[in-house]
UniProtKB/Swiss-Prot annotation:
InterPro entries: Aldose_1/G6P_1-epimerase, Gal_mutarotase_sf_dom, GH-type_carb-bd, LacX. This gene was sequenced from pMG820, a laboratory-derived deletion of the naturally occurring plasmid pLP712. SUPFAM superfamilies: Galactose mutarotase-like. Keywords: Plasmid. This is Protein LacX, plasmid. Pfam families: Aldose_epim. It comes from Lactococcus lactis subsp. lactis (Streptococcus lactis). GO terms for biological process: carbohydrate metabolic process. GO terms for molecular function: carbohydrate binding; isomerase activity. PANTHER family: APOSPORY-ASSOCIATED PROTEIN C-RELATED, GLUCOSE-6-PHOSPHATE 1-EPIMERASE. The gene is lacX. It comes from the Bacteria. Transmembrane segments: none annotated. Induction: By lactose. The operon consists of lacABCDFEGX.
Length: 299
C-alpha cells in the first residue's frame, strides 16, 4: 500500500512494506529519493532494526535469561526492512506505521517489542521518528536502529556525480575504520585519514571503490548534499545518531546513501553478546525509546 502526503512544497510517498519512505518530489516534480533501479540497487530507504550493519557470522548471542547463552540469527541490517508494517494513522501532515515481532523474529531476537515509525511533513522537511517500545515486563531490551535513505545524484539532467559535494556543519578532521565487505565487519583500530580540517567533500566514485564509509567520529550532526552547478540539494540532520554512513555501489550508481546509525557493525575487537556491544540502546521493561532525523529539501 502506498500513502501520500502533500503540501505547497513537497509531495512525499511511503509504503507499508518496510514502513519506508519511497518518494520525495518538489513542487516542480523533481525526484530527490532514489527510485530503486535494480541495475544498481533495488532499495530506497530501508529501516535497520534491531541491528545496523552486520554481526559476526550473523549470530546474536544473549546473556543467560530463561535460556543459557541463547544464540539467534540476525542477518545484515536486521529483519524489519522486508516485513509488512501496519498503517496505524494518516492525517494531513503525518503517517504512522508499526510492527510487532512474528514467531520467526522471536526465535532469533528474544524480546517482545513494538516499532512505530512516524513520518511528519513540515514545510520542506520530512521528520522520521523511530519509537521503540519494550513490551517485556521484566527484561531490558537491547537494540540498534538506523536509517538508510538513498538520494539521486545527480539530481538534475545534464549534471554528473562529480558536480556534487557533501557539506558538513562543522570543520572536520577524522579517520575511518577499515571495513571488510565480505563479512561486513570493521577494524576500529586500523584507521585511514579521511577528512583533514575541511567542511566539504567533493564526490567521486572512487570514494566507494572498496566499501561504505563509516564516519564514527564526526562532530557534525548535519550533512548537506549539494550540486555546485545548479545549487540543488538536501540536508540530513541526525542529532540523535552518533554515526553517519556514506554509501554507493561499486558500479558507479547515480545515487548516494546518507545513513544515520545508532550503532555499527561488529568490530574485530568486540565480543558477540548483543547487550555488551558499543553504543547499544537499552530500553527498560514497558518503556519507549525515541530517535529521529530530518531530511530537508533546500531549493
Amino acid at each position: 500500500m502506498t500513502i501520500e502526503l502533500k503540501n505547497e512544497y513537497l509531495t512525499v510517498q511511503f509504503k507499508t512494506l518496510g514502513g519506508q519512505l519511497t518518494s520525495i518530489k518538489d513542487k516542480d516534480g523533481l525526484e530527490y529519493l532514489w527510485q530503486a533501479d535494480p541495475e544498481y540497487w533495488n532499495g530506497q530507504a530501508p529501516i535497520l532494526f534491531p541491528i545496523c550493519g552486520s554481526l559476526r557470522n550473523d549470530w546474536a548471542i544473549y546473556r543467560p535469561q530463561e535460556r543459557p547463552f541463547f544464540t539467534g540469527l540476525i542477518r545484515r541490517h536486521g529483519f524489519v526492512r522486508k516485513e509488512e508494517f501496519t498503517l496505524e494513522e494518516v492525517n494531513e501532515n503525518s503517517v504512522t506505521f508499526s510492527i510487532k515481532p512474528n514467531a520467526e523474529m522471536l526465535d532469533n531476537y528474544l524480546y517482545q517489542f513494538e516499532l512505530r515509525v512516524v513520518y511528519t511533513l513540515n514545510g520542506k522537511s520530512i521528520r522520521t521518528e523511530f519509537q521503540v517500545t519494550n513490551l517485556e515486563t521484566e527484561k531490558t531490551m537491547p537494540y540498534f536502529i538506523g536509517a538508510h535513505p538513498a538520494f539521486n545524484c545527480p539530481l538534475v539532467e545534464g549534471e554528473k556525480y562529480e558536480d556534487y559535494s557533501l557539506e558538513f556543519s562543522e570543520v572536520e578532521s577524522c579517520s575511518i575504520p577499515k571495513s571488510f565487505p565480505e563479512t561486513g565487519l570493521l577494524d576500529l583500530q586500523d584507521r585511514t585519514p579521511f577528512l583533514e580540517n575541511q567542511k566539504s567533500l567533493d564526490l567521486d566514485y572512487s570514494l566507494f571503490s572498496h566499501d561504505a564509509i563509516t564516519l564514527d567520529r564526526l562532530k557534525s550532526r548535519s550533512v548537506t548534499l549539494r550540486s555546485r552547478k545548479s545549487g540543488k540539494g538536501l540536508r540530513v540532520d541526525f542529532d540523535d545518531f552518533p554515526n553517519l554512513i556514506l554509501w554507493s555501489t561499486t558500479n558507479k550508481s547515480p545515487f548516494i546513501a546518507l545513513e544515520p546509525w545508532s550503532g555499527l557493525s561488529t568490530s574485530l575487537e568486540e565480543g558477540n553478546i548483543l547487550e555488551d556491544k558499543p553504543q547499544v540502546t537499552k530500553v527498560l521493561p514497558l518503556d519507549t525509546s525515541k530517535k529521529s532525523y530530518d531530511i530537508t529539501i533546500l531549493n
